Amino acid sequence: MLFGPPSEILLRKTGKTSRERRDAPAGSMTDKMSKIYERLQKCYECFKAKIDFVPDVALVLGSGLGDYADGIKIEAALDYSEIEGFPVSTVSGHKGRFVFGYVGDVKVVIMQGRVHYYEGYKMEDVVLPIRLMKLMGAKILFLTNAAGGVNFDYHAGDFMLISDQICMAPSPLIGENADELGVRFPDMSNIYDRDLRDIVRNTAKELDIPLQEGVYIQLTGPNYESPAEIRMVRTLGADAVGMSTACEAIAANHAGLKVVGISCISNMACGITDKPLTHAEVQETADRAAPLFKKLVTESVIRLGKAQP
């Protein structure tokens, strides 16, 4: 039996540190791949056979925000259904494709629609796109979502910079560890990178776009939360609630991606108002917020790209 920190165990088992394995070019591993990485490698090979593009920033678009990708300088697009073994979104407002192109001079890959745990996928499937974008070459992951406002000071249409998170869904790291991506027990103390948050915060200030900042909590869905559940998550310290994002941030952090995230407060959570919640309301609010969202994301991505070495 091997004892010691996970990184030392990995070094003794394989002759490679987790960082060496993680930073190695796709397809260069000579020892046995984990099943997770083997599947990921097949998706990557399918991508490379169709698309010749290496992004610097990966962007995930949430409910009602997907049209942002149509406004960038597009070089190529790839439907999820064209990638063998890749999960496909079934939710309205999620187109289900990768868009490759430029935001300013920054090379980006955009997920125009994500998959969710509540759709019946395994958590490994839910975070597969995040891991694939890491293999594509992305160094930064910019997560967006439509979320319910838990903080009484928030209003529908606000933007919230995610400072931290609470994940009430199963961890995407449960089960076999993909040593090729990261260590068994990754640190999460800076899961939303402080330096990247500073960039987005300063960008919003210069653009005169109001920006809240708070804690995001992921529940499983697909049902909206009960008033009692909202009281619970507020007690836990959450400012906004949704059904995605936190698991993606965990997988990204594990794989060595720097993460930043913004929630569009699409509605006030159950119990704050007497109005019933609907998915149509989420999309309607996101549509109204879209112009400012596009402005903030565009300028933030440009500055994030420039900040990379």
Language model features with spans:
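Short, low-complexity intrinsically disordered segments enriched in A/P/G/S/L with frequent Arg
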Residues: 9, 18-29
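Generic non-transmembrane alpha-helical segments
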Residues: 46, 50, 195, 199-210, ...
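Metal-dependent peptidase/peptidase-like ectodomains
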Residues: 178-219
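His/Asp/Glu-rich mid-to-C-terminal helical/loop segments that flank catalytic regions of hydrolases
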Residues: 270-309
